[in-house]
Amino acid sequence: MRRYLRVVVLCVACGFCSLLYAFSQLAVSLEEGTGGGGGKPQAAVASWLAGGGRGAVRGAGVAGPAAHPGVSDRCKDFSLCYWNPYWMLPSDVCGMNCFWEAAFRYSLKIQPVEKMHLAVVACGERLEETMTMLKSAIIFSIKPLQFHIFAEDQLHHSFKGRLDNWSFLQTFNYTLYPITFPSENAAEWKKLFKPCASQRLFLPLILKEVDSLLYVDTDILFLRPVDDIWSLLKKFNSTQIAAMAPEHEEPRIGWYNRFARHPYYGKTGVNSGVMLMNMTRMRRKYFKNDMTTVRLQWGDILMPLLKKYKLNITWGDQDLLNIVFFHNPESLFVFPCQWNYRPDHCIYGSNCQEAEEGGIFILHGNRGVYHDDKQPAFRAVYEALRNCSFEDDNIRSLLKPLELELQKTVHTYCGKIYKIFIKQLAKSVRDRYARSPKEK
């Protein structure tokens, strides 16, 4: 009996010693695996990467299974795995560089939402017109907007008050800038064509941190999301730096091809009321010109152009842009007339085929047509958007009253095709309410 008791005691003692030895080995391995204690999974991964991905987790300078006798052949010198502790490690997986699954592996990489940069220049009595344009941009756009508003000092307070009242929308930010021209020739630039109009020429030099920008005149109305014209930037080839629409579709009524006394782009010139720019490329490019054999950068070419052509230009900064792209046609992307639809496209009969087929995307009420009775179809759209508020019910009810007003204009050439004025607008309203609340 005593013999059996001794055997039992001896077995228990051996088992206890074996257990102690196992725990001590486990503690040592854990200390080595965390680089001496206190390590995190991120630190382990960093250590592994710092060691060139070669077994650095187990200790600095250790390279692969050769340094670990007894390690299975499946432990390659580049082995790395992640192990969920609720499951046993698979038999064919090397455990040398194996980490527990951790939350950091599943952390979401949230990409910052791209902002669309929109610039406008407002002087004189252009406050209300500009605010209506900005409202049309906000109502239908999807991505956030960043407004760059260049205005005379006396308009800043009014702009700030009106825009701050819209801050509840949280879909846009804005920055107000003074009107600034190069000091040496400020007076000459300011009186070119219309007050402050030539400010747009200097946007690439002023907004140095902005990569791309959509410039629009104050008399622009967006009938579909700004996102859509912004997406045209992706269609630029490697040489294109800006995009505009033709000045005319029909050469028989074109201005540049009949009256211009300076070079102009293409057959009928381009209109700069809607101008999409990759300003990074504009700042880098060296432009061909007819003043010197040396190519000039944007900031160096503007004043020489004005000095050479100031007696021959009629439309100011737009004429200078036409001259630039006459000499550098490969740098311009031309988009269809429906992106810059003006009275000239319908007052002599419809001559914008793209608008007839797909509707008007951007309405450009130049010639002051929003404020007189010469083109009542244009004025009807302007008044509808000016009086529209941001409440959902008001936007939903925008179309029917507008269509009734447009039907009263059928005695004019533009009114006869009034349906193209609401075709895209109706789609934009439908799309707005089809989007989820987070997208609005």
From Swiss-Prot:
* InterPro entries named in the record: Glyco_trans_8 (IPR002495), Glycosyltransferase_8 (IPR051993), Nucleotide-diphossugar_trans (IPR029044)
An example Gene Ontology biological process:
O-glycan processing
Glycan attachment positions: N173, N237, N278
Membrane-protein topology: Single-pass type II membrane protein
A GO MF term? UDP-xylosyltransferase activity
Which regions of this chain are Lumenal-facing, per the record's topological domains?
30-440
**Membrane-spanning residues:** 7-29
Q: Where in the cell is it found?
A: Membrane
**Gene Ontology cellular component terms for the protein in this record:** membrane
Question: Which reaction(s) are listed as its catalytic activity?
Answer: 3-O-(beta-D-glucosyl)-L-seryl-[EGF-like domain protein] + UDP-alpha-D-xylose = 3-O-[alpha-D-xylosyl-(1->3)-beta-D-glucosyl]-L-seryl-[EGF-like domain protein] + UDP + H(+)
Query: Which loops or segments lie on the Cytoplasmic side of the membrane, by the record?
Result: 1-6
Chief site of localization: membrane
Gene3D superfamilies documented for this protein: Spore Coat Polysaccharide Biosynthesis Protein SpsA, Chain A
EC number(s) for this protein?
A: 2.4.2.42
- Provide the alphabetized UniProt keywords: Glycoprotein, Glycosyltransferase, Membrane, Signal-anchor, Transferase, Transmembrane, Transmembrane helix
Family, similarity comment = Belongs to the glycosyltransferase 8 family.
The job of this chain, per UniProt, is described as: Glycosyltransferase which elongates the O-linked glucose attached to EGF-like repeats in the extracellular domain of Notch proteins by catalyzing the addition of xylose.
The name this protein carries in UniProt is: Glucoside xylosyltransferase 1
**What is the source species?**
Homo sapiens
Q: Which gene is transcribed and translated to give this protein?
A: GXYLT1
